[in-house]
Amino acid sequence: MPATRLDGKKIAAEIRSEVAADVETFVSGGNPPPQLAAVLVGEDPASQVYVRNKERACAKAGIASRLDRMPAATTQAELLAKVAELNADPAVSGILVQLPLPSKANGGTGIDERAVLDAIDPIKDVDAFSPVNVGLLMQGRPRFLPCTPHGIVQLLHRTGIETSGKHVVVVGRSDIVGKPMAMMLAQKDSTCGPAVANATVTIAHSRTSNLAEICRQADILIAAVGRPEMITAEMIQPGAVVIDVGINRVGDKLVGDVAFDEAEAVASAITPVPGGVGPLTIAMLLHNTLMAAKMQAASN
């Protein structure tokens, strides 16, 4: 029996609808609409698509959006000055700098991404990348949760999949997905309650020598490594839940980090690519932007 396909599009639509209703209530209370400011450096086609998708999602949720375009030749000092400008603008609720920044090979100036992300005011850091917000997450008292891991927690919760007492294997150790995902699931509680926390978590990565063996131990396998169809059926325990975070272009189609067709025959539930985790990332970005606006309104 093939696995249940976990419909990220449907759940993301539910979350966006909830955010839109909350925005309406927030604005009707005399507050200005939340505003998300995106900074796009260079002309990377994929980044431009992502930014357009975010703008459209903001508009549907009643969130104002602002896009600051900067040339690929922008210097680090110029980009830091732009971030400082947005930090100081009271109309801006949330700030995101679209990654990746242009490499020198693509006309960039070698900007230190970490320095730029560190410069964003933590109360406007809706991607939750700043050291302050990462530290709060580590302590179990997060201000904002990283969008993709939080979207996965919402997906698990809203489809009735519990992680408490389960062995979760996260393949990938990025600061954006792998590390925060592991930390969130290992906590005693979550935004969705303790049933979507309290996991025993293993982080695997490209240097893990016995990767297939470790993956086969997972009750829930989360693939976030950025390698097309790296996770094959023989790496999946029969009946496991498989969450595929990867988005990779192979020829004229998008594929995940999981070999979907063969994995679907082994797993009990699986996210497709596209239409799985991706839509949830933007939905949680809207959620974080509204949260930021509420916190800033309360502090004024």
UniProtKB/Swiss-Prot annotation:
Q: Which reaction does it catalyse?
A: (6R)-5,10-methylene-5,6,7,8-tetrahydrofolate + NADP(+) = (6R)-5,10-methenyltetrahydrofolate + NADPH; (6R)-5,10-methenyltetrahydrofolate + H2O = (6R)-10-formyltetrahydrofolate + H(+)
Cellular component GO terms, alphabetically?
Answer: cytosol
Going by the UniProt record, its keywords in alphabetical order are: Amino-acid biosynthesis, Histidine biosynthesis, Hydrolase, Methionine biosynthesis, Multifunctional enzyme, NADP, One-carbon metabolism, Oxidoreductase, Purine biosynthesis
* Pathway(s) it belongs to: One-carbon metabolism; tetrahydrofolate interconversion
Q: Per UniProt, what is one Pfam family of this protein?
A: THF_DHG_CYH
KW Amino-acid biosynthesis (keyword) present: yes
Which SUPFAM superfamilies does its entry note? Aminoacid dehydrogenase-like, N-terminal domain, NAD(P)-binding Rossmann-fold domains
For binding NADP(+), which residues are annotated in this chain's numbering?
172-174, 206, 247
Q: Which GO terms describe its molecular function?
A: methenyltetrahydrofolate cyclohydrolase activity; methylenetetrahydrofolate dehydrogenase (NADP+) activity
Is Membrane one of the keywords UniProt gives this record? no
This enzyme's EC code(s):
1.5.1.5, 3.5.4.9
An example Gene Ontology biological process: tetrahydrofolate interconversion
Free-text function comment from the UniProt entry: Catalyzes the oxidation of 5,10-methylenetetrahydrofolate to 5,10-methenyltetrahydrofolate and then the hydrolysis of 5,10-methenyltetrahydrofolate to 10-formyltetrahydrofolate.
Instruction: Note the subunit structure.
Output: Homodimer.
Record family assignment: Belongs to the tetrahydrofolate dehydrogenase/cyclohydrolase family.
Q: What is this protein called?
A: Bifunctional protein FolD
